[in-house]
């Protein structure tokens, strides 16, 4: 029933949604015609998004609220979909890998510049492939299967983006089902559907991380519905597309079912079968991953902000990289045990455990690429934790600034990002403590 309160809510969201669409269009236009710069577009969109989140969490809603949310989400995606990718060139490798497979060649066998693949070179895809002169593909088997499937429909960037956006958009529908199953308002899907990270890193850049999101959401939904085999299938699919979702396993394996090996067997079997499909290249089925670890400083420790901060900010110059690895491993192991022991404490508790594991993993990893944080967004729709809402939104904006350049600038970016997130977390804790123990007047 439409009331004055819900009319205010819907009017506010309609205006905010329209502004989000306009800013998507302006961001696309900034590629060719500088007006205010993409960084300003990103900042404005991030601020409007946070206002929209506040509205949907604190204002009354009706059936039209959900319609407005979905329509605006679709409109934003369509604006970004039909524009060329400009924040990343990864999608050109996706199309290339699909074409290589269509030619009957294992995509892990040759680098794009290899003479064996000269017959596949063209002017639309090949010149734009990053690391084409020295890097094998890094994308896991699940991603490779998607690349092959989509390029059989159309071997173009637009078709690849359409495939990724189509899969990502399924996440909205799945999240609505999950919200309803948990007794939460379906309008909270706005937290996911309107997030600028999704709009620009999936709808605009077409990152394959977006294709993992519906399977992560499905794993959560099947867990809530007490379907362990289906949970395992969805988790395995997400893992084969992007490796990190496997970290959710301890939270999604019910302690009461520890004698039931179906779920872990399904996960292990599907992941093994996926890699076996490309095993004709032997250990090279890992692709560029080992070299990538060196290139990104994963082996030396230069990649990890918390380690760098300990060495330079806290002046623990002699702290070895191995100590950070041990600390990270023990912390994640402890969280895994905690999640497993709490798997029978309720569906929301298990989801919260998974969210904590995913968050801690990403904070330890301190990715140099914003799309790696995409998998946190489905959790935020279920658990709107303010510090991580701030973190993911600020992350989106800061990566559009000059602070995102590798080197000292990026260190200062992380120092600002982690520091302000810590302040937001402390303020939330203080507010909660004050609410529980108000001062006597």
Identify the role of each PLM range.
Residues 48-58, 149, 156-182, 186, ...:
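Transmembrane-helix motifs of polytopic, lipid-linked glycan transferases
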Residues 172, 271-275, 293-367:
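Aromatic/glycine/proline-enriched transmembrane-helix motif characteristic
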Residues 1-79, 180, 346, 350-352, ...:
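Start-transfer (signal-anchor) and selected internal transmembrane alpha helices
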Residues 61-163:
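Intramembrane catalytic core of multi-pass membrane enzymes that act on lipidic substrates
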Residues 385-441:
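Aromatic-enriched
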Residues 170-174, 200, 211-227, 358:
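Specific aromatic-rich, kink-prone transmembrane helix
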Residues 63-68, 175-197:
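Transmembrane-helix signature of polytopic, membrane-embedded enzymes
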Residues 69-76, 257-280:
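Hydrophobic alpha-helical membrane-interfacial segments at the cytosolic entry of transmembrane helices
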